């Protein structure tokens, strides 16, 4: 303690001759003369106790309970920071500690029930809205109304696609014939070859997250990326061109793949599926002929306004949504090949998105992780199934950012991904997107 009472102003320590008190507290005033006024700690001007000055300064620092508490708080913060660092180094590409069966077991049985009447009610609702919008726009025929019509009708075309998509998965009903009839009517009306797309989409689900075997929006390898001519490379990663890719995909598939959704001999299909592909191509051609005939009834300009522009809006919705469910630069989604790929790990590379008011309109397709793992679940059960599965998925589930009524925030996600997510390595089994610096600077 001697060092603690040394003065910073050269004051001497307590005299060694001072008696050591035997009592902790002085209760009798008469005992106060225990200390003589000539002792070195008192001023020589001492006259009684009315005027005296202690020549020992206060210690520079006295450990206190408050200081100890502060030290404990700092230690807790250090430990907490270590925990945060552990969270930050979570490896989304590592094999998950759960199995597909664990997720399935967590989902309530009612989520697997398909109600054809409920499914059909959505078809009736959407078709009625489509016809009502077209009738209203044709009647008003006002240039202030047309842009609103295009946005609304294009979104409804996209909603029809999602219902046809459910038919293709068999989540619409347990009746294969009903699924096929409704699927053809819905998809043909928006110029999609139902069976051709259904089969290729099945391939997409069976190989999701696989660099080479995935069917749609799969990453380009570095070799393929660098083999593209400048125009193709720029168009693929520059808006709005990627958002208009779907019709070209139906005809020619993605870069690095060959075949067509309209060609029954394409390597997309096995021989047993060729009749189905022909049927869908005939339905698609019939719809195209009907649209061509309507040109002579209402005129080509009116057809462009009533159908052509909404069709393009629908295509943009389709490309926008499907791209963002499998891309997100900030989310660092892994891709696999070889022995590292599995159905479960591939499905966990998908990501949910919140579309605000559009969620209900396009039948909750934004709840995409559970849909990809279990495409048999009807769309009207996906939200409940997702909530039930979250405790099992843990960190492998990426909570979507909450959207405003219109999902404008997703435009930023799209732009960042197109600017940074260009290709993956030609080698390795767990891969992440890499950036072409030259292409990134051009954007």
From Swiss-Prot:
Taxonomic source organism: Helianthus annuus (Common sunflower)
Transmembrane segments: 120-140, 143-163, 281-301, 304-324
Similarity comment text for this entry: Belongs to the fatty acid desaturase type 1 family.
Enzyme class: oxidoreductase
Major location category of this protein: plastid
Metabolic or biological pathway, per its Swiss-Prot or TrEMBL entry: Lipid metabolism; polyunsaturated fatty acid biosynthesis
Chain span(s) of sequence motif Histidine box-1: 165-169
Tissue: Highly expressed in leaves and cotyledons, while no or little expression detected in mature seeds, roots and stems.
A Pfam family matched in the record: DUF3474
Function: Chloroplast omega-3 fatty acid desaturase introduces the third double bond in the biosynthesis of 18:3, and probably also 16:3 fatty acids, important constituents of plant membranes. It is thought to use ferredoxin as an electron donor and to act on fatty acids esterified to galactolipids, sulfolipids and phosphatidylglycerol.
Protein name according to UniProt: sn-2 acyl-lipid omega-3 desaturase (ferredoxin), chloroplastic
Transit peptide (first-last residue): 1-51
Any GO BP: unsaturated fatty acid biosynthetic process
Domain notes from UniProt: The histidine box domains may contain the active site and/or be involved in metal ion binding.
EC number: 1.14.19.35
Entry GO terms, CC: chloroplast membrane
Renumbered ranges of motif Histidine box-3: 368-372
Membrane topology, record value: Multi-pass membrane protein
GO molecular function terms listed in the Swiss-Prot or TrEMBL record: oxidoreductase activity, acting on paired donors, with oxidation of a pair of donors resulting in the reduction of molecular oxygen to two molecules of water; sn-2 acyl-lipid omega-3 desaturase (ferredoxin) activity
Keywords: Chloroplast, Membrane, Oxidoreductase, Plastid, Transit peptide, Transmembrane, Transmembrane helix
Cellular compartment(s): Plastid, Chloroplast membrane
């Amino acid at each position: 303690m001697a060092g603690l009472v040394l003065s910073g102003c050269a004051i001497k320590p307590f005299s060694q001759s001072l008696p050591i008190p035997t009592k902790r507290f002085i209760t009798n005033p008469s005992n106060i003369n225990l200390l003589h006024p000539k002792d070195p700690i008192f001023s020589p001007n001492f006259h009684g106790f009315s005027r005296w000055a202690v020549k020992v300064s206060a210690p520079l620092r006295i450990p206190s309970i408050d200081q100890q508490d502060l030290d404990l708080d700092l230690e807790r913060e250090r430990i907490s920071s270590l925990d945060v660092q552990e969270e930050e180094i979570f490896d989304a590409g590592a094999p998950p500690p759960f199995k597909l069966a664990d997720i399935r077991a967590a989902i309530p049985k009612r989520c697997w029930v398909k109600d054809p009447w409920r499914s059909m009610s959505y078809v009736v609702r959407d078709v009625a809205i489509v016809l009502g919008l077209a009738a209203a726009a044709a009647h008003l025929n006002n240039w202030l109304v047309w842009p609103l019509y295009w946005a609304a009708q294009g979104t409804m075309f996209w909603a029809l696609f999602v219902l046809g998509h459910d038919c293709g998965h068999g989540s619409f009903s347990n009746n294969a014939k009903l699924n096929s009839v409704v699927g053809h009517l819905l998809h043909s009306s928006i110029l999609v070859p139902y069976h051709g797309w259904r089969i290729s989409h099945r391939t997409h689900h069976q190989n999701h997250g696989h660099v080479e075997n995935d069917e749609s929006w799969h990453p380009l390898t570095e070799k393929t990326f660098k083999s593209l001519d400048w125009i193709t490379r720029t168009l693929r990663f520059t808006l709005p061109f990627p958002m208009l890719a779907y019709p070209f995909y139906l005809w020619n598939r993605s870069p690095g793949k060959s075949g067509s959704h309209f060609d029954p001999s394409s390597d997309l299909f096995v021989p047993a599926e060729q009749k189905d592909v022909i049927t869908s191509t005939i339905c698609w051609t019939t719809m195209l002929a009907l649209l061509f005939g309507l040109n002579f009834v209402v005129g080509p300009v009116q057809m462009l306004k009533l159908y052509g522009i909404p069709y393009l809006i629908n295509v943009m919705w389709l490309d926008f949504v499907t791209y963002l469910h499998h891309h997100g630069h900030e989310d660092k989604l892994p891709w696999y090949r070889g022995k590292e790929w599995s159905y479960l790990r591939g499905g966990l590379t998908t990501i949910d998105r919140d579309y605000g008011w559009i969620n209900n309109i396009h039948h909750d397709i934004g709840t995409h992780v559970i849909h990809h793992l279990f495409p048999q679940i009807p769309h009207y059960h996906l939200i409940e199934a997702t909530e039930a599965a979250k405790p099992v998925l843990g960190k492998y589930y990426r909570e979507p950012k909450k959207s405003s009524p219109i999902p404008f925030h997703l435009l930023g996600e799209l732009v960042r991904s197109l600017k940074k997510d260009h290709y993956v390595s030609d080698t390795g089994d767990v891969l992440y997107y890499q950036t072409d610096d030259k292409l990134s600077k051009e954007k």
